[in-house]
């Protein structure tokens, strides 16, 4: 549950600018359905409105639930479910406890409510009602992010005071990825170590029937600003992988690039799907040039093939003792930045996987750390040598060896960045 004392502190610290924005600023007029309508009606409505993420279920003008496109489509996709559910009431796939907020609720309070209610609300959206509880429309987590990014400078002191709470939120976002990772991999490690209590490095894993999708993400900055960016990326990535985009990491990067540039106003095109991006963009103050370096990987476990697309983040791998550590080199453009074109196309690279092959990803916090006698960067060569010398050992032991070498190399030098490092054996 959300700590009420944090909410009270936030209310006390609201600036005049923050007080101008309320939940109705995010209102999107979206057609609802009634409990009397069938799942066939919902399917038709979703097809007519491809941008709808969710549909409210309303009875006597009061919202009673929320149907999410992802869950609805996945439910009907199961064998015989169209025959079983098409003509039944749409409440069969309804979330009976969605977040419903008053149109006059402040953005500050709304942000805490959305984060406190978990990842589901950030991804699927929330219902906005009037003072009588009557349905007005929907708000999306994506639009909320746009407002919060604009208000971030004004709220920095408050966010810093809530840093411990932010750390809990960030770790909760990572939990499902750890669970899926342990389900699909037998010998692996994942080392996540923010420079501060929260950070801009993020990892993602999601299992599917035919394989799993893996991502290592290094967002702009560290600390609170970096952590805020990871929440944006986590929400976007969940949405992107709903369709068959998981089989096309380069395509997923392209979609992510467009979403980030639009959400943060790092675009020249003012077409923003009905949302007044210029009103909320930090670009108008010349402050926003944020994005991420990342590697997206789709592992087809049935075919034994890895498809990789990288934005300034390489993939390291080694097959046997007779070979050196090899790299799949990334494209040299990051995701979402002002100098990355809206239509930039990343490249997919395929790697056949053999039993026992070891694969590794790391953010630049490890590679770029200054240390040693010469006070130079740790570097890819030193990292590759460590991998080659130890790849036959269990992955958790490799993690300990690499990280101890990193700590020893850093010595008394200042820590430069967050570190996120993962490895797995196929």
How would you label these PLM feature ranges?
Residues 46-50, 55-72, 114, 124-144, ...:
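A glycine-centered beta-loop-beta connector
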Residues 101-147, 151-154, 192-194:
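Sensory/regulatory domains in signal-transduction proteins
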Residues 225-244, 353, 357-413:
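Active-site-proximal, acidic helix/loop segment immediately C-terminal to a metal-coordinating Asp/Glu
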